[in-house]
Amino acid sequence: MEKKRDLRLVKQRLKALEKLQVDVKYLDDIPELYEEYRRHKLPKYQFTARCVRTGALFIAYGREKSVTNAALFLLTLHEHFKRYGIRLEGSVVQTDNGTEFTAPWNSNKVTIFTKLVERCWGAHHHRIPPGAKTYQSDVESSHRWIEEELYAAETFASEQEFLQKAAQYQKWFNCSRYNRYKGNTPLNLVRETYPALPEEAVVFPPVILDNLLVQYKAELAQWAT
C-alpha cells in the first residue's frame, strides 16, 4: 500500500503531458471483434499514447506494427499538440523494447521513432527494462478498458463506422469519463497545467496511420537524417 501511495504522489507531481506511455495493442485476438475485424479488413494494431499525470488517451491504428507507423503516430500527435500551444520539450516518452520503437539490442542504430522523440518533440525516449510490464501500467489499463467498453461492446458495420465509434470513445474517455484513481476527468486534469484549454485539444480523432505515409514521407525523411 505504501509503495502504491508513493507512486501516486510521484504521478501527481507531474505536469500534464510531461510523461507519456506509448504502446501497441493487438486487435485480432479479441473474440467479440474478430468476425468484424476479418469481414471489414479492420486495422490489426492500435497505437496508444497515455498521459501518466492526467490519464488522457490518444490512439491511432495501423495495418502494420512498424517503426514507420509509430513515427507517423508521433508526428500527428506533435502536430495536434502544437496547434493548441501544448509544449512537449523536456517531456518523457516511455515505451517497451519492441522494434516498432527501438533498434534490436545488438544494434547501434537509432530508430526514426527515437529521433522524432528527441529532435521533433525535444523530449526523452525512455525504454523500460525488458519484461517489466508493470512500468507500462497506465497504458495497459487503457487497453483493458477500451477492449471492454468499445471493441467487445459495440458492433461495426464498416471500417468507417469503426473509426467513428473509436473517435466517439476517445472523446468520451478524455472529456467525460471520471477517473476515480486520479480524481477527475482527463480534460480537467490537463487544464490544471493549461487553464482554459479548449476541449478539442484532447480530442484526437483516430486515423489509419498507413494511409498517411505519402503525406508525411518528406517530413519523415527530414527527421531520419
Place the predicted regions along the sequence by residue.
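Short glycine-aspartate micro-motif
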Residues: 19, 47
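RNase H-like DDE/DDD metal-dependent nuclease/strand-transfer catalytic core used by mobile genetic elements
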Residues: 24-46, 52-164
